[in-house]
Amino acid sequence: WFHYRRNFWLLIFGLINIYVFLWPGDILVTYALSGFVLWFIRNWKARNLLILATFLVSIGSLQNFVLKDSLEIARDADIEEKASFANGEEVSEEISEWAQAWREYEIENRVEIDTIQIEIEKRTTSYTSAYEFNLKAASDTIYYLIPFFLFLDALMMMVIGMALFKLNILDGKKDIRFYIRMMSICFLVGLSINTYEVWMITNSNMDILETNPYLRSTYHFGRLFMALGYIGMIVVLMKIDKFSSLRLRLACVGKMALTNYLMHSVIALFIFSGAGFGFLGKLTWSQLYLIVPVIWALQLY
């Protein structure tokens, strides 16, 4: 029951993060829900965990492919319907339904200048107005993003992590050459996939069907290989015993991971929302990047 108590409180902190600290991009709720499930497979062998992880990654990738394919059909139907109306022709009920589905998706996902200005005003006027604006995004996270996307995201990575732990990879017990190969191969694959995805996005002129990661069948493979590459890199740095001071500070940050994560939400709340300075939409990219090292320095030193 200790495991479930911890995950219960993680769930509570996640809900506080979403509804009090106004961060709808919270990961704690997703992690807690995944943790409830992982208890039942804690004694599985690494081989079985990897089989399950492969299945979950495949399901996630297939889901992304089907969603994008369906939306492309809907967009084509919308184009066909408009062309038919222009020519005074009738369209089938099926085409109309697909076209309507596309228009609803487009309205929900296409960002307009007026919409941005309304969001900035509501999020920077006061905490109350920011809270009211956040409610829809929070509901989308709880009732849509987590059950349909984020839960599977977290679960597949946690299962892979459990398998790597049982294979003595995460604890650095393998030879350094193993981790160098792991880092090199995984970064090569991961960066290749990510480069391809960026090319697709820019080449499409930021098409809304290309910018959404959950409409890319390569998404899970790219992030998986990048994660494995970072694991390999971190273990290599530990084994060569360099940057000892930085590693010690990062270890301390890791021990306070939950506190630091929630503090990011609190800091951002007071910097950007109406609860504090209300700087949302007022800072340039260069000014935003100056804030990042300041927060890092506070956490590390």
Would you name each region that the model predicts?
Residues I208-Y301:
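Alpha-helical transmembrane segments of multi-pass integral membrane proteins
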Residues F13, N17, I59-N64, M157, ...:
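Alpha-helical transmembrane segments of multipass membrane proteins
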Residues W1-A74, M263, A268:
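Internal alpha-helical transmembrane segments
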Residues W39-I51, A163-I185:
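Solvent-exposed interhelical
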Residues I27-F40, F149-G172, G222-D241:
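Specific transmembrane alpha-helix
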